[in-house]
Amino acid sequence: MVQAKSWTLKKHFEGFPTDGNFELKTTELPPLNNGEVLLEALFLSVDPYMRVAAKKLKEGDRMMGEQVARVVESKNSAFPKGTIVAALLGWTSHSISDGNGLTKLPVEWPDKLPLSLALGTVGMPGLTAYFGLLDICGVKGGETVMVSAAAGAVGSVVGQIAKLKGCKVVGTAGSDEKVAYLKKLGFDVAFNYKTVKSLEEALRTASPDGYDCYFDNVGGEFSNAVILQMKTFGRIAICGAISQYNRTGPCPQGPAPEVVIYQQLRMEGFIVNRWQGEVRQKALTELMNWVSEGKVQCHEYVTEGFEKMPAAFMGMLKGENLGKTIVKA
C-alpha cells in the first residue's frame, strides 16, 4: 500500500500564515480501480493566489495547488506508467486519479527544459503573463509598460514579453538583488520601491510621459500611485494584490474615480482559466519556444523536500523568492 502525505489547512489564516495553520497528514491509498492511475509528485507549486483561495477551504481540507507528477501505476491506457502530467492535485505526495484534469506535457517538450517549468514560465504563471499583457492590456510596440512585483513568476515574464513586442518596460521589486535581476532580463528601468525616497517621483523619473499599460500584481497604495501616472486611454490588468492578502484591517481605498474617468482608463481583473482549448495550447507552445530559444529567461527558487511546503509558501509571500517558487518533492 502507498502512504500519501498531504498538507492540510489546520486553521484558517488570520493575517500572515504561520506553521500552526498547517498540518501534515498521512493516509493509506486504496488499490487502483480500472481506469485509474497512481501519481507521485515530482514538483509542487506555491503561488500567491493560494492565500486568498484558502478562504474557500474548510479546516482540515488539503491545501490546493498544481504539481507535476509521474504515473507510477496505471489501469488507464490513456496514461501509461511513466507518463508525466500537470494537474491541480494539491499539496500531496501521492494521489489517485481517473484521468480527469490531468494534462500531459507536450510531446515536443525539449529535453533541455526542466519539467518544473510546467508550473512556471510554461505553465499557469507564464500563461497569466501572456494573456494579461497581450489580451487584457492589448499592448502595442512603442508603448511603455509598468510591472509591479516584476521579479516574481508572473511579472518577470510580463516584462520579457513586453520587450519582445517592442515596448519600454519599467519594473519594481523589493530588493537590490531583484532589481539587478530585472536589468539582466532586459527591463529598461528597474528600482527598489522599498528604498526610494518617493514612489511617485521614482515612477515619474522612470517614465516622464507616463504609462500606457500597468500590469498590477500588488494592489493597494502602490497601485494607486501608478494609476495617477497612467496616460490617457491607459490599460490596467489587475492580476493580483499580494500587498493586501495578509491584511487584518479594512481594505485601502482605491484610485480616485475622477482619475479613471478623465484619463479614460480601462481596468480589468482576470483569471487565467478564462483562456482554454486551442488558444491556451497555442500560448503554451509559444512560451515553450521562447524559453527554448533563449528569448525568455526564467529563474526558479527551488526548495527541496515535501515537508517544507508551508515554509516555501510563507517565504514566497514574504518575497524571499527570485522568480518562480517550486518545491521539489
Curated annotation (Swiss-Prot):
GO biological process terms on file: leukotriene B4 metabolic process; lipoxin A4 metabolic process; prostaglandin metabolic process
Protein family per UniProt: Belongs to the NADP-dependent oxidoreductase L4BD family.
Post-translational modification N6-acetyllysine, affected residues: 178
Lipid metabolism recorded as keyword: yes
Location in or out of the cell: Cytoplasm
GO MF term list: 13-lipoxin reductase activity; 15-oxoprostaglandin 13-oxidase [NAD(P)+] activity; 2-alkenal reductase (NADPH) activity; leukotriene B4 12-hydroxy dehydrogenase activity
Protein's name in the database: Prostaglandin reductase 1
NCBIfam families reported in the protein's UniProt record: B4_12hDH
Alphabetical list of PANTHER family matching this protein: PROSTAGLANDIN REDUCTASE, PROSTAGLANDIN REDUCTASE 1
Gene3D superfamilies: Medium-chain alcohol dehydrogenases, catalytic domain, NAD(P)-binding Rossmann-like Domain
Source organism: Mus musculus (Mouse)
Residues annotated to bind NADP(+): 152-155, 178, 193, 217, 239-245, 270-272, 321
GO CC entries: cytoplasm
Quaternary structure note: Monomer or homodimer.
Domain of life, source organism: Eukaryota
Gene: Ptgr1
Modified residues (Phosphothreonine): 18
Location of N6-(2-hydroxyisobutyryl)lysine modifications: 178
UniProtKB keywords: Acetylation, Cytoplasm, Fatty acid metabolism, Hydroxylation, Lipid metabolism, NADP, Oxidoreductase, Phosphoprotein, Prostaglandin metabolism
EC id: 1.3.1.48, 1.3.1.74
Substrates-to-products reaction catalysed: 13,14-dihydro-15-oxo-prostaglandin E1 + NADP(+) = 15-oxoprostaglandin E1 + NADPH + H(+); 13,14-dihydro-15-oxo-prostaglandin E2 + NADP(+) = 15-oxoprostaglandin E2 + NADPH + H(+); 13,14-dihydro-15-oxo-prostaglandin F1alpha + NADP(+) = 15-oxoprostaglandin F1alpha + NADPH + H(+); 13,14-dihydro-15-oxo-PGF2alpha + NADP(+) = 15-oxoprostaglandin F2alpha + NADPH + H(+)
A Pfam family hit: ADH_zinc_N
Task performed by this protein: NAD(P)H-dependent oxidoreductase involved in metabolic inactivation of pro- and anti-inflammatory eicosanoids: prostaglandins (PG), leukotrienes (LT) and lipoxins (LX). Catalyzes with high efficiency the reduction of the 13,14 double bond of 15-oxoPGs, including 15-oxo-PGE1, 15-oxo-PGE2, 15-oxo-PGF1-alpha and 15-oxo-PGF2-alpha. Catalyzes with lower efficiency the oxidation of the hydroxyl group at C12 of LTB4 and its derivatives, converting them into biologically less active 12-oxo-LTB4 metabolites.
Broad enzyme group: oxidoreductase
